[in-house]
Amino acid sequence: MSRLLLTILMTVFLAACMPLTPAPVEAPLATPGVPVQANWTIRFTQSGGIMGMMREMEITSDGNLKVTDDRTGKTVTGQLTAGELAQLSTLMGGLAYDRPSGPTSCADCFNYTVEIASDTGKTFTAQADDTTLEASGLSPLADYLRTLMENALKTQG
């Protein structure tokens, strides 16, 4: 009797240690460029990493910029140049996002979220981490947004 009980307990224990299998999802479809409407807001979040970073940036279609670094408690505001705004619009229009197929096991990676809301009420959201960023097609936009964020935090501090 004790062997049967031990076998059952070990089976339950091992089953609890197994990774969860994500629910099946439809094959990810590539998202063509985000239509840039007359008025839009883009929110970019970079979180995670070894340092536990949490940075958020919001840019509006008129070029207003707000960056918050939760770890340092720093918030800066600014204005994009016409060239920076044009580059951002080009990258949004050329975005070809391919949603990663499942969770990754990268504990110390940065996680990136891009959310673009337009005045039509539609919102586009894309997520990736360091291991899926390049394959997702989000890399050019995320890299540019990360550069804008880092520059804003450097220049106003």
Describe the role of every protein-language-model region.
Residues M1-I8:
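Bacterial N-terminal signal peptides that target proteins for export
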Residues L5, M18-G49, D70, K74, ...:
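Short, well-ordered, aromatic-rich surface patches in folded extracellular/luminal domains
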Residues F13-A16:
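C-terminal motif of bacterial Sec signal peptides marking the signal peptidase cleavage site
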Residues T45-D69:
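N-terminal secretory signal peptides
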Residues M57, V76-L80, A126:
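Generic detection of short hydrophobic beta-strand segments and adjacent strand-loop junctions
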Residues V76, T81-T90:
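Long, charged/polar, surface-exposed segments that mediate recognition or autoinhibition
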Residues M92-L95:
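Generic short beta-strand segments
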